[in-house]
Amino acid sequence: LWASYCAPCFQEFSHSQKLFAFLKTNNIEMLYLAIDKDKEITKWHPNIKNNYLEGNHIFTSDQIQESLQQLLNEPDGVYIPRYLLFNSKGELVLPSTKKPSEGQALYDEILSALK
């Protein structure tokens, strides 16, 4: 989960290339959910391109954001940056993982959770 106004999100993006390599090696897909407001949509594509964000991207609607709040039991809004882990069945395994800047600790957490 990220947004165009989130400076910590962009700090984490700087660690993305190593994360992409790990995910590819382990056959794991990346899905980015942008929780920007509609007025920010013009910043969305340039931010994806400028930060070399490989993977799938969704600019979330208000309805999706509400569903995320319910799923994560955070009625006042979800915090970002945030990394969720789902298994191959689409089940939420980790509602909040370590960050890409944590490197190997994140990779170990992912592999352990998907066993």
Report the location of each language-model feature.
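Flexible loop/turn segments at secondary-structure boundaries
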Residues: 5-8, 37-41, 65-67, 92-93, ...
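Short active-site neighborhood of thiol/selenol oxidoreductases, capturing the structured segment around
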Residues: 1-10, 16
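Thiol-/selenol-based redox modules, centered on thioredoxin-like
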Residues: 80-115
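Short, internal strand/loop/helix patches
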Residues: 45-80, 84, 88
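Active-site-proximal beta-strand/loop segments in catalytic clefts of secreted hydrolases
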Residues: 1-3, 33-36, 60-61
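Active-site-proximal structural scaffolding
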Residues: 9-12, 37, 61, 76-79, ...
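Structural microenvironment flanking redox-active thiols in thiol-disulfide oxidoreductases
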Residues: 11-51, 64-70
